[in-house]
Amino acid sequence: MLGQVVTLILLLLLKVYQGKGCQGSADHVVSISGVPLQLQPNSIQTKVDSIAWKKLLPSQNGFHHILKWENGSLPSNTSNDRFSFIVKNLSLLIKAAQQQDSGLYCLEVTSISGKVQTATFQVFVFESLLPDKVEKPRLQGQGKILDRGRCQVALSCLVSRDGNVSYAWYRGSKLIQTAGNLTYLDEEVDINGTHTYTCNVSNPVSWESHTLNLTQDCQNAHQEFRFWPFLVIIVILSALFLGTLACFCVWRRKRKEKQSETSPKEFLTIYEDVKDLKTRRNHEQEQTFPGGGSTIYSMIQSQSSAPTSQEPAYTLYSLIQPSRKSGSRKRNHSPSFNSTIYEVIGKSQPKAQNPARLSRKELENFDVYS
């Protein structure tokens, strides 16, 4: 109702002010708010030197310059940025017309010769009774892996001005949901299926849509899910390997300890250097474990002169059993202990002696090996 009143007032003003600035009949232009509006004059058959677009302001009882243009220069906009000038056809463009843009517009074209031509437009901008144009929706979503090769998809679709709008959901090209107020979608799909979703928002005059592909989310989750069994297998094999290695090390250590306990001790070798026949000492050598033995080396330097090079040396070997009688030299009483006695002498004709009849002094001249 208010728009009709404004229109009637403008028509009356047009009759009053017509002829005071712009001559001729006015072209009527009707538009709705929120859409671009272009005022284009008929073809001008003269060489243009300058132009001026003006709008009638009833409050000021005259015309107000919107923009000016001279040949070879840029347009000079004396109004706001909602107006622009198209040089090619001398048109005035209102980017988004509003109700306050209604009124009388006049175009003055000045030729090079100074002749002025005019064109008049009566503009009526009405508020649309229909909803505004739908904006592009904001579609967000994510995929989550589930058991048995399933993927859970969660989506949300919103617009800034959602009054009197309807929502429709598509998976690929298939319509899956037609509920008008359903801004959220939650469903389970197969991992190997289609994961491209489209949200369509519409009202009686326009519609917009937004598409989102969640294939990568579901595939990445599926690959992560398939990786877990391999990871578990690797961990189990590593644990088995480490356990086997630890058992082997323990078994080897116990085996070495057992071998060290059962293995016989090494033989003990005693070296004795006797330089003086008068030196007397008791030789004690005891076998501490069965089956063992010891070797006694006695280096004896006799007081007699060493054999000369003319006298050949002979070696006497005798196998004796040590006496059980205690004496100055103690021996092992084990039956398995045997002694080998040999003597290096410098006699020309060695004479074997009975080891059993040798005196202690004579026995000291022998080397004993066991």
Swiss-Prot record:
Which region ranges are annotated with the description Disordered? 324-370
Q: Point out residues bearing the modification Phosphotyrosine.
A: Y271, Y297, Y317, Y342
UniProt's post-translational modification comment states: N-linked glycosylation is essential for the binding to its ligand CD48. Also O-glycosylated, in contrast, O-linked sialylation has a negative impact on ligand binding.
GO biological process terms, semicolon-separated = adaptive immune response; immune response; natural killer cell activation; natural killer cell activation involved in immune response; positive regulation of granzyme B production; positive regulation of inositol phosphate biosynthetic process; positive regulation of interleukin-8 production; positive regulation of type II interferon production
**For side Cytoplasmic, which residue ranges?**
251-370
| Glycosylation positions in this chain | N71, N77, N89, N164, N181, N192, N200, N213
UniProt topological domain (Extracellular) ranges: 22-229
One of the record's GO cellular component terms: plasma membrane
Which N-terminal stretch is annotated as signal sequence? Answer: 1-21
The motif ITSM 2: which residues?
295-300
- Location within or outside the cell: Membrane; Cell membrane; Membrane raft
- Record-linked Pfam families: Receptor_2B4 (PF11465)
Motif position, ITSM 3: 315-320
Q: List the disulfide bonds.
A: C157-C199
Q: Where is the Ig-like domain?
A: 22-127, 131-215
> Where does the source fall among the domains of life?
Eukaryota
* Motif, ITSM 1: chain positions: 269-274
Motif segment (ITSM 4): 340-345
Tissue expression from the record = Expressed in spleen, PBL, followed by lung, liver, testis and small intestine. Expressed in all natural killer (NK) cells, monocytes and basophils, TCR-gamma/delta+ T-cells, monocytes, basophils, and on a subset of CD8(+) T-cells.
Task: Spell out where the chain crosses the membrane.
Answer: 230-250
Please name the InterPro entries in this protein's record.
CD2/SLAM_rcpt, Ig-like_dom, Ig-like_dom_sf, Ig-like_fold, NK_rcpt_2B4_Ig_dom
Q: What does this protein do?
A: Heterophilic receptor of the signaling lymphocytic activation molecule (SLAM) family; its ligand is CD48. SLAM receptors triggered by homo- or heterotypic cell-cell interactions are modulating the activation and differentiation of a wide variety of immune cells and thus are involved in the regulation and interconnection of both innate and adaptive immune response. Activities are controlled by presence or absence of small cytoplasmic adapter proteins, SH2D1A/SAP and/or SH2D1B/EAT-2. Acts as activating natural killer (NK) cell receptor.
Question: By its UniProt entry, which PANTHER family does this protein fall under?
Answer: NATURAL KILLER CELL RECEPTOR 2B4 (PTHR12080:SF56), SIGNALING LYMPHOCYTIC ACTIVATION MOLECULE (PTHR12080)
On subunit structure and binding partners, the annotation says: Interacts with CD48. Interacts (via phosphorylated ITSM 1-4) with SH2D1A (via SH2 domain); SH2D1A probably mediates association with FYN. Interacts (via phosphorylated ITSM 3) with PTPN11/SHP-2, INPP5D/SHIP1, PTPN6/SHP-1 and CSK; binding of SH2D1A/SAP prevents association with PTPN11, PTPN6 and CSK; conflictingly a similar association has been described for phosphorylated ITSM 1 also including GRB2 and PLCG1. Interacts weakly (via phosphorylated ITSM 2) with PTPN11/SHP-2 and CSK. Interacts with SH2D1B. Interacts with PIK3R1; PI3K recruits SH2D1A.
Could you give the domain comment from the record?
A: The ITSMs (immunoreceptor tyrosine-based switch motifs) with the consensus sequence T-X-Y-X-X-[VI] present in SLAM family receptors have overlapping specificity for activating and inhibitory SH2 domain-containing binding partners. Especially they mediate the interaction with the SH2 domain of SH2D1A and SH2D1B. A 'three-pronged' mechanism is proposed involving threonine (position -2), phosphorylated tyrosine (position 0) and valine/isoleucine (position +3).
Q: Could you identify this protein by its name? A: Natural killer cell receptor 2B4
What is the originating organism of this protein? Homo sapiens
Q: Which gene encodes it?
A: CD244
